[in-house]
Amino acid sequence: MEYRLFGQVTRALMDASQAPADDIATRIDALDWNRKVWSALATDCALPENQLPMELRASIISLSLWVGRHSSAVMRKEEDFEPLIEINRMIMQGLAGRADAA
């Protein structure tokens, strides 16, 4: 389920990165969706009942904060989409590895 969600939001980021510069709605929608996904992950990692190792939880929360900052910079056209896409791809690889190990 998480893998599919990351695949969908990453595809939206890729599409937004190729959209015309004046297509602000596509950019905003993709960045906002990605930010919401990461925010939900961070919120879940902050819960005491979360079963992930503390170090991994802290890393996910840290990445979520970075995603928020970088997304704002992308909207200001100070940064590009590629780092957001790459991080999501790395998460997808980790999720695929977890599914293979199960």
Curated annotation (Swiss-Prot):
Keyword Manganese attached: no
BP-aspect Gene Ontology terms: bacterial-type flagellum organization
Keyword Chloroplast part of the UniProt annotation: no
InterPro entries: FlaF
Domain of life from the UniProt record: Bacteria
Any matching Pfam family: FlaF
Keywords, in A-Z order: Bacterial flagellum biogenesis
Intrachain S-S bonds: none
Protein purpose: Required for synthesis of the 25 kDa and 27 kDa flagellins and appears to be important for flagellin assembly.
Stated name of the protein: Protein FlaF
Organism of derivation: Caulobacter vibrioides (strain ATCC 19089 / CIP 103742 / CB 15) (Caulobacter crescentus)
Lineage, top ranks: Bacteria, Pseudomonadati, Pseudomonadota, Alphaproteobacteria, Caulobacterales
